[in-house]
Amino acid sequence: MQNKQNLIWIDLEMTGLDPDTDVIIEMATIITDSELNTLAEGPVIAVHQSDETLAKMDEWNTRQHGGSGLTQRVRESTVSMAEAEAQTLEFIKLWVPERSSPICGNSICQDRRFLYRHMPTLENWFHYRNLDVSTLKELAARWSPELKFKKGSTHLALDDIRESIAELRFYREHFIKP
């Protein structure tokens, strides 16, 4: 059910960091309520890319995405960038009215840059504001360096979103005092 207070969490895995030369290879979404309770998990989509495109990945991306199995999932996928955008938009429309939720995640500006370049209809669904958990991470590192949130590092989209939500819960409990 749509609610203006629901939050859209998104994570992308890409072939690199430049939206003009790199592409999205995986995306996932989660909807939470304003208290960070998960309401629904959206589709986890490996976006098909050609072998030629995948061969352009740098060493880190080649190793990381190859080791996680993502590169193989991308090769085997039949889902185009446009289809991935449409499936994700169809899911979030069930939960959040247009332009009411900030885009939520870790280092979310990077994801937003890729959405703007490759999935503009989806990017336009979000409010112009960002809810970036990495802002709190940076502030905690400077103002309360004893606070440490332990993260995994699968670099798979759904795992990364779950970690981002857990990390925001951690900062809410230990860093943001009522």
From Swiss-Prot:
What Pfam families does this protein's entry cite?
Answer: RNase_T
GO biological-process terms attached to the record: DNA metabolic process
Q: Active-site residues?
A: Y128
Keywords (alphabetical) are: Cytoplasm, Exonuclease, Hydrolase, Nuclease
GO MF annotations for this entry?
Answer: 3'-5'-RNA exonuclease activity; nucleic acid binding
Q: Which InterPro entries match?
A: Exonuclease_RNaseT/DNA_pol3, Oligoribonuclease, RNaseH-like_sf, RNaseH_sf
Q: EC number(s) in its UniProt entry?
A: 3.1.15.-
- Extract the Gene3D superfamilies matched here: Ribonuclease H-like superfamily/Ribonuclease H (3.30.420.10)
The cellular component terms of Gene Ontology attached to this UniProt record, alphabetical and capped at eight, are:
cytoplasm
Cellular compartments annotated: Cytoplasm
Residues annotated as domain Exonuclease: 7-168
Q: Per its UniProt entry, which superkingdom is the organism in?
A: Bacteria
Enzyme class, UniProt record, top EC level = hydrolase
Function summary: 3'-to-5' exoribonuclease specific for small oligoribonucleotides.
The record's similarity note reads: Belongs to the oligoribonuclease family.
Q: Which NCBIfam families match?
A: PRK05359.1 (NF003765)
Q: Which PANTHER family match?
A: OLIGORIBONUCLEASE, MITOCHONDRIAL
Its recorded name reads Oligoribonuclease
What species is this protein from? Pseudomonas syringae pv. syringae (strain B728a)
